[in-house]
């Protein structure tokens, strides 16, 4: 029999007699208890479901007597019935569209006085409940006065729990009377009773609000304690989102003192005090999870019971997605999620006919007590309706889902919608590019995309999709699977971009599971350097050379980046390297301003060990700088970026391009960063330089930067950022090395031997490893830099001429170069050594197309520095000395600056911007510089702007300067008049520092010069 939903379209409250007479007899169902209030539409949304009442366990020869002709039971049938009949079997399965819970309980015949069991399908109570959920009665009918003196029976919505006896002589629950028997009953028998205020010594009632039980029969006398044998029955009325505690009229209660937060009221029979029952679900061991409107699902609750006197097996059905756990105890049931979409309920008892004791205090589940999955007993299962197919279950291995609990007051449809992720939100969570191993295995081993569902309301292992959502889920799955093609590169998953440049991109990656690769990967993450392969240009050649060098070096040294694989696709080449997650050494120094001597010594020893290992393998890096030195998790050095690296000596097999020189490591390519590169790269007259000595110079610059926090030769006032490369290297060659005060003696000594402009006088690698500064790290050199251990190995360049077939991975159809390299033409040494652009986007040295312009005396701008497009935006000027800690450097090996006479060369270098040919008698005007500070020993210089300009123009007199520093005027004036090419500087000492070339305009005030903050202040020139 199909249930017809109950609709109330009238504004007035209809009589309960009309509601009962027009209602159908419907089977009662027990449903789950949820904290979330369902909307009003939930009363009629679930159209077909199957419910089944199981036979009551009887004693003796009592047999059930079902009625097959009529679903109604008359009063005579009820009187003659002494057992609990089965209302309908599997063939006759009427459905009822509701979420109510019934009150099947034992009762007694009022006329005979003998016990009998409820056996009818009565929907009058359900109709009244549905009616009362839409109509609130604020006044008590006059018929209720004999039972209760309360003025109103509007109580908070709560589950209905009653304890009745099996041995009572009268009916303990409301039953419907037929119209033919209504005349035989007296008026008092037809008086409706409000169970909310039914009080007795032995009866404890927890009822629902807004319930009127008109035309129901109740026992004339209340049984005593001796006649009672309690049994628990749970009723959950419909909870709508429209009802809340704020709408309750608490003033109308006469005996109510407290109302619980969940709206559950427990009425005690011994006193009129009403105590709240805040954990009703917990007392029955029920823990329910909230459902959502988007999960159009049907869960099935099956129940199985052991032989237990007076208990009914429960079968629950609802459109909500449930997660129910019943505590496993002596007197309570146990419900747990099974592997499928069904739930099983098991009632445990010690003996077969043991009586059920009264409910004890509510127990709470601890974290260690997890409900075990129980098996489903036969004969106790049912299907979900004809309109709803079997819910589909998708298992999520190793995917943790957090479950959110909601209280009864705050749970509503609005809150539910806010917590439901949309399809776009799921895609934005980057499930396809997971950051951990568990999600990675789920996405790529199971080959399943995340469906459109609310994972917060599902269990930890399963979530369910109804048939209505199959189409949406399949479309989303196809969309997500299609988008995964853009996230793979060979047998690797591409992640975020961590670096860009002219050559291409550097991306994070993860190896796909089940990939046929014999390469040992120390970490699950890798770094993939991707270069376009559409054109056979110098970038591709450099990439192939880098692959050959890294493959020839092997993964034997801990301070050199590890090579893993080479991938070739239709349009790209890629080098797969080990991921170093500590960042660049540049950022590490910049965050700490400078490093301690012990830390810098340890990092420098690791750097020297790695570079010495490269040299022993015949490899020159040629681009050592702070940006190419990485740090791992333990803050250890890892040398990376071999874009400029090349080979030399007996490792070079290209004999037709070999150099007939005594030194096999001579090169002619001007590469690398200017501030780290050795000066012989530009100033060498022969055009050749030693690659090993150039790497040693770069190591010295890195050590100086770690100790000081800034670079040693980047403070030229006329070339602040080293844009003019020839002038930069001239400045390096002609400027003595000055150290800060906090440098230790051993660090100064090793830097003096490394940072020598002449490569012939520069210290060798073996002498550096034996220096006293690195004496505490000798064990590192003995392990990885032993001369006997560095035996000759096959040349890395020889691999460039070897061609072999590429191994094809079983996971992807893209060729993966795991053990061999395939290159087209043979790369000559000229192409390896003469190409200017770098793969990593470093500074590119190019000849200027503009005419040669003289910058200063003897210096011409014949070569300028141009950064490559899209190069890394990082200036060396970030590493500067702190402005608030500027101190003059101490001049070593000189007791007094005034006693030592500097040479003419030093004087000309200090005043090169003011020198003019002696043949020109025009006055000197400072048009290219702006003096920042002029300091004399133990004197303070204070002068006006006109005095300074007159001094520089040669139109000065002693009156401008007074008697403070007359020697300065005399010497400058004699220099301007060209009295002699060299003059006596015995009494003069001047430290001049400039900021930047700037046209002198307007009136120059010396007080402004004193107030300016100096950008850098390192070099001191003495004359």
UniProtKB/Swiss-Prot annotation:
The record lists ATP as bound by 498-506, 529
Basic and acidic residues bias (residue ranges): 889-898
Q: InterPro entries from the entry?
A: Kinase-like_dom_sf, Prot_kinase_dom, Protein_kinase_ATP_BS, Ser/Thr_kinase_AS, STK_Kin4/ppk1
Q: Where is the composition biased (Low complexity)?
A: 104-115
Instruction: State if Mitochondrion is listed as a keyword.
Output: no
Q: Which SUPFAM superfamilies match?
A: Protein kinase-like (PK-like)
Identify which residues the record assigns to the active site: 623
Q: Where is the composition biased (Polar residues)?
A: 60-103, 294-314, 333-365, 372-381
Catalyses:
L-seryl-[protein] + ATP = O-phospho-L-seryl-[protein] + ADP + H(+); L-threonyl-[protein] + ATP = O-phospho-L-threonyl-[protein] + ADP + H(+)
Q: Which GO terms describe its molecular function?
A: ATP binding; protein serine kinase activity; protein serine/threonine kinase activity
State its Enzyme Commission number(s): 2.7.11.1
What CDD domains has UniProt attached to this entry? Answer: STKc_Kin4
Q: Which UniProt keywords apply?
A: ATP-binding, Kinase, Nucleotide-binding, Phosphoprotein, Serine/threonine-protein kinase, Transferase
Gene3D superfamilies on file: Transferase(Phosphotransferase) domain 1 (1.10.510.10)
Q: Quick one: where's region Disordered? A: 55-119, 285-314, 333-381, 883-906
The first-level EC class reads transferase
Tell me where in this chain the Protein kinase domain is found.
492-774
Which residues get modified to Phosphotyrosine?
A: 492
- GO cellular component terms attached to this protein's record: cell cortex
UniProt similarity note: Belongs to the protein kinase superfamily. Ser/Thr protein kinase family.
Write down what this protein is called: Serine/threonine-protein kinase ppk1
Tell me the organism: Schizosaccharomyces pombe (strain 972 / ATCC 24843) (Fission yeast)
Question: Where is the organism placed in the taxonomic lineage, from the top?
Answer: Eukaryota, Fungi, Dikarya, Ascomycota, Taphrinomycotina
